[in-house]
Amino acid sequence: MIEGKMKIRVGIIGYGKMGQLRHQASEATGLSEVIAISEPNLVDGVGEGLPNLSHDEIVSREDIDAIVICTPNFLNKELTIAALRAGKHVFCEKPPAFTGKDMEEIIAVEQESGKCLMYGFNHRHHDSVMKIKEIIASGEYGSVLWMRGRYGKSVTDDYYKQWRSKKELAGGGILMDQGIHMMDLFLYLGGKFDTVKAEISNLYWKMDVEDNAFVILKNNDTGCVASLHSTMTQWRHLFSLEIFLEKGYMVLNGLITGSMSYSIEGAEQLSIAKSRSAAPAATFEDEERLRYHTDNSWNYEMEHFYEAIEQGFEISKGSSKDALDLMRVMDKCYEQKSF
């Protein structure tokens, strides 16, 4: 930020775990100042010194430049549209909406408003993922042939009591909640996907939303195929992303999160190797193994949002176009739901 320049004034709607995390990341950028929050179930001692207003009050305040939305999924679309119409820049947590049609409606309002709209897909901003993107973009390893992503967690019976277990409030289950991050990475690293085959099922928890999603995607132009397993019956938490290219591979095991339950011995481990002989007996140079111990994604993501507002450039990670492409793929998945 230019010295002496006024900070971007921010209101946060939804001040639970994610709202508080976004607050911390916003302040870490040095570009913004949170001046108000909206949280009907505010915990004692949280958000002290900040006015706790209604959603409408946050949206209508003239001294707020940008709104960060961290609410249950069913509120995301309506709050995004309301904030854009009120002339605010908007950062909204995933999922951006429930369907591709929802995103089309949001984009129409965004274009009328002329304001920045960005969505929270922080996995794109992990240092390990940015390294993968850099290598793919360099062309050194050739084109991406295939990708395989596995992302899973376990839940408890308490999950039945949460809004995430209700279709009308969450929009979907584990695929909408967690698998959407891996799907977003597929699009980020592999481009568009035209063909989608999915098995969306409820194998164990028997609730209103899916607990498992098995998805195969194909880019008809490049031939790249990606497979995804998103599950809430992964009793031992797992994050694994494999990318195999014409001349080598990259495998990312583990992800640094707040719980650290997805990490590999406290780190994200990225293995990189380049092939040096022809198939079928291909051998590889010694793998380069990079370990990442810190999650900087939240700060990077908020910095990108606030810099876009300040400098007037287009969002390049988590744009409304990214969200539209993603939700159209999600639509194709849920059209094949088997329960």
Regions found by a protein language model. Give the residues of each.
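Hydrophobic residues in well-ordered beta-strands that form the structural core
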Residues: 69, 92-93, 117-119, 148, ...
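Rossmann-fold dehydrogenase core element
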Residues: 105-122, 142-147
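C-terminal glycine/acidic-rich active-site capping loop/insertion
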Residues: 122, 242-317, 321
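Predominantly a Rossmann-like dinucleotide-binding segment in NAD(P)-dependent oxidoreductases
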Residues: 123-206
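Active-site beta-strand termini and strand-to-loop segments that position acidic
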Residues: 215-223, 243-245
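Beta-loop-alpha module in the N-terminal Rossmann-like domain of NAD(P)-dependent dehydrogenases
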Residues: 49-109, 297
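C-terminal helix-rich "cap/oligomerization" subdomain common to oxidoreductases
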Residues: 1-4, 66-69, 221, 290-292, ...
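N-terminal Rossmann-like dinucleotide-binding module
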Residues: 2-48, 339
